[in-house]
Swiss-Prot record:
Family per similarity comment: Belongs to the unc-93 family.
Disulfide topology: none
UniProt organism field: Schizosaccharomyces pombe (strain 972 / ATCC 24843)
Taxonomic lineage: Eukaryota, Fungi, Dikarya, Ascomycota, Taphrinomycotina
Protein name: UNC93-like protein C922.05c
Transmembrane feature ranges: 64-84, 97-116, 123-145, 149-169, 186-206, 219-239, 275-293, 310-330, 343-363, 391-411, 452-472
């Protein structure tokens, strides 16, 4: 039976009845199909001039929606954090809040994948976005009334909700694309997500360009709060995973949650049966270890507010470039997935050594004691030698994106199942946050800059070495799993090709 005849038979079948029926396909026999009257509109691709838009129910569209949620929530949060000290002169309060944030994030994040499987991606993402506006509101409040308790509460609440947001985000980004497109989807997400930080960085840069004030204004905080609230609401417009269609015409695979007890049991079973995933934990742990150093001990310590804002803009723009470079290589079909995984490991390792080696030359110029002295002059972008510092910060941003894109790609290469990837992503963000919590506390305790710098370099290199057995032994040419056995759709979408609109 041809696909054209199949489309005609489907239209006849649903013309008089909207009940779910069984439709035959050439390869798989009967598959359950959705009634046209209930679902057809989300698979249409309306024309805009000469071009067809993406179907609303396509995996790419849903990935873009998730990316815009992260653009507005953690993207704006990153823009604020990148200024150092949450935009304030004194980083101690923001550091304490971040310790609370990442400690709670680490605790809940380990179970966030199970929560996502239980209540669904859409609701998990929406709830997860609410913490960002609350946290930013607490910083605005502190600026006027010095309510330290509210800032700590804001950090705790954000830690609880952010774990949920990132578990849902990871499940979508890693399970919605086809295997050969996973790095491209990661790059699309990373580009849009960090565009939020880029645009968010322009606002304080514009406000402080001709100002001698060393902290951001009320308008900046208020703008961030509004945008973050909009981002949380945007998540409610997503299509459920089971109604989302991949590029090959298959539904995204997701199993219905069986309740809290079985979700927690599944979490334990994952660690027991796939014990080798523990070798990836140091990589997860170190993936944000360096950000406190870069934001507080590099950017905040050495530069004035307008230069920090400019550095922030360059850093997040470099992240977009870094993720694009990673995607070009990791999805390069000239080499199979095993080769890309192994060569990628070597390239990331070399980049870490080269870039952090350059950072050592900069770090030797100052200490925590020297920047605290009254005669220390913070650097402005008009000062001689600033260009070299700017390029170092750009390379730091690119390396962050490349390292995390590679980590995402490795996780996504281990499975195609949304539920399992949500659990993996919970592990990733939990351990990442545990590392961040420790580093913010280390910064509050005023450990020497050089000690912190050395720990960053050592952890990044060491974590790759520990992860190498998984990369060498567990990354296969393709991932065999339940998802790969799901029959294609027979509801007017292509049986063995890309998504086709039901109606023009």
């Amino acid at each position: 039976m041809s696909s054209d005849n199949l489309d005609i038979s489907m239209e006849k079948k649903y013309s008089a009845d909207v009940d779910v029926e069984k439709a035959p396909t050439p390869e798989y026999g009967e598959v359950e199909t959705a009634p046209l009257s209930q679902s057809s509109w989300i698979y249409r691709r309306p024309r805009i001039g000469r071009f067809k838009s993406l179907a609303y129910g396509s995996a790419l569209t849903q990935t873009i929606i998730v990316s815009w949620v992260c653009f507005l929530c953690p993207g704006m949060f990153n823009a604020l954090s990148g200024l150092g000290g949450g935009g304030e002169v004194n980083a101690d309060v923001a550091n304490d809040a971040n310790v609370a944030l990442y400690s709670t994030f680490a605790g809940l994040g380990f179970f966030a994948g199970s929560i996502c499987n239980l209540i669904g991606v859409k609701l998990t993402l929406a709830i997860g976005g609410t913490g960002y506006s609350v946290y930013t509101a607490s910083l605005l409040c502190y600026k006027h009334v010095y309510n330290r308790g509210f800032v700590i509460f804001g950090g705790c609440y954000l830690g609880l909700t952010a774990g949920m947001l990132w578990a849902a985000q990871g499940a979508v980004i890693m399970s919605y694309p086809r295997e050969e497109n996973k790095a491209r989807y990661i790059a699309i997400f990373w580009g849009i997500f960090n565009l939020g930080a880029v645009i968010g960085s322009i606002v304080p840069l514009a406000q402080t360009m001709h100002s001698s004030v060393n902290s951001v204004g009320d308008g900046t905080y208020a703008g961030f709060i509004v945008l973050m609230a909009v981002g949380s609401a945007l998540a409610l417009f997503m299509v459920s995973p089971e109604k989302t269609v991949k590029e090959d015409g298959k539904f995204v695979h997701i199993e219905k949650s069986m309740g809290w007890k079985k979700e927690l049991l599944g979490l334990v079973q994952t660690l027991y049966k796939e014990y080798w995933v523990l070798l990836l934990f140091p990589m997860f742990f170190s993936s944000n270890w360096f950000t406190t150093y870069q934001f507080n001990d590099f950017n905040l310590a050495y530069f004035n507010i307008r230069t920090r804002s400019l550095n922030n803009l360059l850093y997040w723009f470099a992240q977009i470039m870094g993720s694009a470079v990673a995607a070009l290589f990791l999805d390069w079909q000239r080499f199979n997935r095993v080769i890309r995984a192994r060569v990628g490991w070597g390239l990331v390792f070399v980049l870490i050594c080269v870039i952090w080696g350059g950072g050592l030359a900069f770090q030797l110029k100052y200490t925590r004691k020297s920047v605290a002295e009254s005669d220390f002059v913070v650097t402005d972008f008009t000062h001689r030698g600033y260009t070299g510092y700017a390029f170092l910060y750009i390379f730091y941003g690119m390396l962050d994106a490349i390292f995390q894109s590679y980590a995402y790609w490795i996780i996504g290469s281990l499975s195609n199942d949304t539920n399992k990837l949500a659990v993996y992503m919970g592990f990733y963000k939990s351990l990442q946050s545990a590392g961040a919590a420790i580093t913010y506390r280390m910064d509050t305790l005023n450990i020497p800059y050089m000690n912190y710098f050395a720990s960053c370099w050592a952890l990044l290199c060491g974590s790759l070495i520990v992860a190498s057995p998984v990369i060498w032994k567990k990354i296969k040419l393709t991932t065999e799993g339940i998802e790969d056995e799901i029959p294609p759709l027979a509801n007017g979408l292509a049986v063995d090709g890309p998504v086709v609109p039901l109606k023009e």
